[in-house]
């Protein structure tokens, strides 16, 4: 593990942190003793005496440099935002994703025989991923509060309220299929300030997912920069910008989750039958991250996870649905919980759950009309004198 950590920190330069933030602590509930000898965010990360992030700005502080394919993660972020705190946080999370990707490839899949607050069994790799992400947020010095699906309580990370962020994450979505060698991933959303309740997904300033499969990728979007962007982990341990998605087109690809709901949700059964009749390509792995990511990569398709009287909502709004909704909508797609975008749902409790669909415009219109009779996205037909 020490070797993997060391290789991750090679040639990484992060923006300077104000000394006033140097005392931030990882929450006491996070035991990092096992990581002490090979800390990912310790002295091995080279800190500069000057900020390494140079952003070209006009007088009104608008960005004047366009990001390009081939940019490193640091180069991309320096061009995409003037917020050095956000740059640092996203860089630190990138370091954590890199290490989690290595551990997923080499992990033992034995269970720890423990469960989280929600009752889900945690695997050893879940626990490690959780620790690494909390450590990354602590080391960023710009995270005020954080919580995870495995530790669903606000943890004070010691960062500032003004100019700082609060982060919610699912450390390893799909950990139960690691042993099958399917792709799995990490999801996180970034909100400004110190609030993770009383907010909506549209309030996010950034969201991202890490995908650990044949390739390790870091897919992110920023509120003030167009598109959703994919970074590939190269052999030398650097993230390289390889894809920009700004449009989700129409195409016959479907990814239906929670199919047991079709037994007592006739409208969902009708929708699934439509996909089959129209000869859609079925691509579903059971891992939400790769299943949603394919819509961004292929630039087409639909993902659904629908509820019924006996198949209740399982997907968590804060940790999964809102961050992925942000990525999809920044990519030019749409999201829905049936009557509105998932980004417009207020997070009232950390454990709020919902049904969801992500996809192209026409697919989301079809989803809403089939399940609820009408769609907010469909343009009204002119009548009377307006016709």
UniProtKB/Swiss-Prot annotation:
Residues noted as binding Mg(2+) 1 in the record, renumbered to the chain: 120, 149
Note describing how the cofactor binds: Binds 3 Mg(2+) ions per subunit.
GO biological process, one term: fructose 6-phosphate metabolic process
Record localization: Plastid, Chloroplast
Residues engaged in binding substrate: 173-176, 284, 314
Residues the entry annotates as binding Mg(2+) 3: 170, 173, 320
Keywords annotated in UniProt: Calvin cycle, Carbohydrate metabolism, Chloroplast, Disulfide bond, Hydrolase, Magnesium, Metal-binding, Plastid, Transit peptide
Enzyme Commission number(s) from the entry: 3.1.3.37
Annotated pathway: Carbohydrate biosynthesis; Calvin cycle
Presence of the UniProt keyword Mitochondrion in the record: no
UniProt keyword annotation of Metal-binding present: yes
Entry GO CC: chloroplast; cytoplasm
Record field: catalytic activity: D-sedoheptulose 1,7-bisphosphate + H2O = D-sedoheptulose 7-phosphate + phosphate
Organism domain of life: Eukaryota
Enzyme's top EC category: hydrolase
Cofactor(s), names only, from the UniProt record: Mg(2+)
Short name of one Pfam family: FBPase
Cystines in this chain: 109-114
Family indicated by similarity: Belongs to the FBPase class 1 family.
Subunit composition and interactions: Homodimer.
Protein name: Sedoheptulose-1,7-bisphosphatase, chloroplastic
């Amino acid at each position: 593990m020490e070797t993997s950590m060391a290789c991750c920190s090679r040639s990484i330069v992060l923006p300077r942190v104000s000394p006033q933030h140097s005392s931030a602590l990882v929450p006491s509930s996070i035991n990092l003793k096992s990581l002490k000898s090979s800390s990912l965010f310790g002295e091995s990360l080279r800190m500069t005496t000057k900020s390494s992030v140079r952003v070209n700005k006009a007088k009104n502080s608008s960005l004047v440099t366009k990001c390009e394919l081939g940019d490193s993660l640091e180069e991309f972020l320096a061009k995409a935002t003037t917020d050095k705190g956000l740059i640092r946080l996203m860089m630190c999370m990138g370091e954590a994703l890199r290490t989690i990707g290595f551990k997923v490839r080499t992990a033992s899949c034995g269970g720890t025989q423990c469960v989280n607050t929600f009752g889900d069994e945690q695997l050893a790799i879940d626990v490690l991923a959780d620790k690494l992400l909390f450590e990354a947020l602590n080391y960023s010095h710009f995270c005020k509060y954080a919580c995870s699906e495995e530790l669903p309580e606000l943890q004070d990370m010691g960062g500032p309220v003004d100019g700082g962020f609060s982060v919610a994450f699912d450390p390893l979505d799909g950990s139960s299929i690691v042993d099958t060698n399917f792709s799995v991933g990490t999801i996180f959303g970034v909100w400004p300030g110190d609030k993770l309740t009383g907010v909506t997904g549209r309030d996010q300033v950034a969201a991202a997912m890490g995908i650990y499969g044949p390739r390790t990728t870091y897919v992110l979007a920023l509120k003030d920069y167009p598109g959703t962007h994919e970074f590939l982990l190269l052999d030398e341990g650097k993230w390289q910008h390889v894809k920009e998605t700004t449009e989700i087109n129409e195409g016959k690809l479907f990814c239906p989750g929670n199919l047991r709901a079709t037994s007592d949700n006739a409208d969902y059964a009708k929708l699934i039958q439509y996909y089959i009749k129209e000869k859609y390509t079925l691509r579903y792995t059971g891992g939400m991250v790769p299943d949603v990511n394919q819509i961004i990569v292929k630039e087409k398709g639909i993902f659904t996870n629908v509820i019924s009287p006996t198949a209740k909502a399982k997907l968590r709004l804060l940790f999964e649905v809102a961050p992925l909704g942000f990525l999809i909508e920044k990519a030019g797609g749409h999201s829905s919980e049936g009557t509105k975008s998932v980004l417009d749902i207020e997070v009232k409790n950390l454990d709020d759950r919902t049904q969801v669909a992500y996809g192209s415009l026409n697919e989301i219109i079809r989803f809403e009309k089939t399940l609820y009779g009408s769609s907010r996205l469909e343009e009204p037909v002119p009548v009377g004198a307006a016709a």
